[in-house]
Amino acid sequence: MNKLNSVVVARGAVAVLLIGLAGCTGSLLEPKKIEYKTASANKVPTLEVPPDLTSPTRDDRYAVPDTSGKGAATFSAYSAERSPQARAQQKSDVLPEVDTARIERSGNQRWLVASGSPDKLWGPVKDFWQETGFVIKLELPDAGVMETDWAENRAKIQQDFIRNILGKVIDSVYSTAERDKFRTRLEPGSTPGTTDIFISHRGMYEIFVTEGKDQTKWQPRPADPELEAEMLRRLMVRLGSEEKRATAAMQAAQEKPLERAKMTRGPDGSGTLEVEESFDRAWRRVGLALDRVGFTVEDRDRSRGLYFVRYVDPEIDNEKKEEGFLSKLNIFKSSSSGKPQTQYRIFVKDDASRSTVQVLTLEGGVDQSETSKRILSLLYDQLK
């Protein structure tokens, strides 16, 4: 059964149960904007205190001893471990301090600058995605890359009368025609002791391909910068920033920026992207742009300014056999479906106060092909 018809089928199957409820009325709660589905995301509600009682005040004198693994053998050593200073130190070992976390923006791209090394932030970032409702599909700690599996935003399902009454009884039958996934990159920041965290979104939507509406296929949809921004804001809160402070930081980054990139053509027809950024910032922005347009970074050499990438069809990634949108354009299609996609070299070069971006051939020369021009065009849309 295809997913677009699932709601209709569910309504028909339970219509007889609702005849007696026709006269019932009630208000529907405003759904959350983001509510991704996963089995591990369901949490047991906290115990509610009856109106005539008050919540007990916590007294650390009766707290269960922590198992920090230090194994204090004397009462004085044990008391030292249980002191407020010691507990504060243990807490900092679990969740890094990010009082200096901030949102930076260049063009239509945003990223989070947080205190701590990538290794120290890796665990909290992974926890964030799992708590948000995603399954982690790819983990490359050495490369600083983490990617979620495809998931649906349950908040986009219409909260109609039928679904509101039956609730979770038939909730699994309902689904949306959209899927989202996110890739996170953690890189050492330009300031020692900080990490730049980039979040890129990729989306798919399901469409009918037959007049009888009995077959569907998935198509890629554009990256959503606002959804990326919301995830950055939530991650900032998850890492320790106050809600109001994180919201204010994101609002401050909403100003419409000046165009930061332009395309030029040489006498030989080769294309070059000129980015009005220093190499450090241009390198990071190009990496995020590659994530957004569907490239997989197989390797990178910052000292040489090179990204080694391949294009990954999102439909294949979503376990569908149909060709994706970019594949239909024959931009990245290999000569044989059984062969792996061609590897491309994206070259970022420092040029005084700005940077340039080019596509290179395997021999190291500037690629003058139509494919190269289209790749630069895709990057320009992200970097301008």
UniProtKB/Swiss-Prot annotation:
N-palmitoyl cysteine lipid attachment residues: 24
One Pfam short name: Lipoprotein_18
Locations listed in the record: Cell outer membrane
Biological process per Gene Ontology, one example term: protein insertion into membrane
Keyword Lipoprotein: yes
Major localization listed first in the record, in broad terms: membrane
Superkingdom: Bacteria
InterPro entries, per database record: BamC, BamC_C, NlpB/DapX
Family of this protein: Belongs to the BamC family.
Task performed by this protein: Part of the outer membrane protein assembly complex, which is involved in assembly and insertion of beta-barrel proteins into the outer membrane.
Protein name: Outer membrane protein assembly factor BamC
Upper classification of the organism: Bacteria, Pseudomonadati, Pseudomonadota, Betaproteobacteria, Candidatus Accumulibacter
Encoding gene (name): bamC
